């Protein structure tokens, strides 16, 4: 996927932003695969003097949901901090039994542009996220999913998100979901003579 944003922002700055994403999958077997991916949301370099007249921060408009940037939603709306975000990821998919699967994804998050916190440039490495999802298909309509995620912070992430320094170096998130996908069909009723 590749998107460009051009125009004028609400504060009359020129917009020159982009987003691109790519995935390459290698099938190990019929049920097992490895995927290498990269997502890039452009950002504005706040150490530059051009920030008064130009923004390079890509706006997702409504947020990308969980399609990009992991399940922990730390970067659900990357334009909040303005510096953009890069996500290098590796996903392992394993088929378990007849109807089960396990997916594990490791993300490496970095800032593509400089970010200033109190006038000091922040290191671009924000940390790593690990997402694990187990899916058990019960029948053709119902499945159960369970997920666990953890994020390993760097000092830069603490500065970017305004966390209190040295109050723990990771976060945890878990969830359980019942998925129902009914198959709805419409049959034409025959007229009887």
PLM segments and residue spans:
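Transmembrane beta-strands of outer-membrane beta-barrel pores
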Residues: 1-6, 38-44, 77, 106-112, ...
